Amino acid sequence: MTSPFDINRPGGVGGDPVALLLPLTGRASVLGQALLDAAQMALFEIGDEGFTFLVYDTQGTAAGAEDAARLAISDGAAFILGPLFGQSAQAVKPIAATVGVNVVSFSNNDAVSGEGVNVFGLLPDEQIHRIIAHAAAERHSRIGLLAPVGIYGDRVTDAAIVAAQQAGLEITKVGRYELGEDLSDTIRVFAEYNSRRSSLAYQRKQLAGRSDEIAKQTMRRLEGLETLGDPPYDALLVPEGGAAIRNIAPLLAFYDIDPKRVQLLGTAAWDDDASLGDEPALVGARYAAPSPILRHGFDQRFKQFFKYAPPRLASLAYDATLLAVSLRTAGETADFSAEALADAAGFAGVDGIFRFLANGQNQRGLAILEVRESGPEVLVAAPESFAGL
């Protein structure tokens, strides 16, 4: 290992070691190593000399995860953290279930949850419900949605429709786009730019032949406008981050969607990019994600330990390690049962509070963040307990 400490220690927790399944080789090896580093840092900071962590390479494939799980079980693992990908978690499920070993996967694909597999990734449905509830609290009533074509886009569209209904709002327009395509035509149609521009031209034509004061005042008001009227939504949800939101945001401004009249909304997919405020069209946009307050300290400590900045997902491995250590009774025996994992009071980590549900999905306390030029700022604090949630 290249880390400053070894997580494979002698002893163990009641003779029940915890297996960590990560892609340490293959296409996701850099991310896998970062998650391993985060897990090591958690153990180092806790200072628990009696904890045994067994590390296995999944090679970033379902077949590799299956082999790793079999080896972990044969080595006596009583609890599995990982694997990272949904297909890998699906491959591990029957192997772990056969011997009654529970799994906490770092995937956010809730389709693989259940039957002993708990997904620990940030679930988009919950984020969408949180940000749409915030939009309702801010007195928005009509939501537009831009989502990619595909399974993820279908899922977030369905989630947004349900969330809007529950919040008493209406999804008034849905736009879908192909990943990697030129988005100009899609955004122009979604913004109803042509019809709004035609409305402006028609209004100017109607006023051109009039000389009364009201007509003159109206013409002055229309000066400098590109379109007339607003699009059919007062908030716009774009549940995709990375290059997609950076490509979409300036096009929204180009096609005259005024951020002062249409609130831009997002999800934790935006949380990978702390420099979103560099894009002027995104300043003032809001999204639902774990509070960054505790994670900021984690990021600093990680960088001090390992001399590189952690990827966003690294905190999942850190918190999962804290979870594994916490699942012990006062008698130092491990309780990795489904009942212990489903503790209604939940757990806490650098990404805030979380708990697992009976179906293997997770629930988190999410904050509302606002994009600023200096970086994201907490607008609405994340809950500190699940009381009332």
Set out the residue ranges of the language-model regions:
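Extracytosolic ligand-binding ectodomains
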Residues: M1-L389
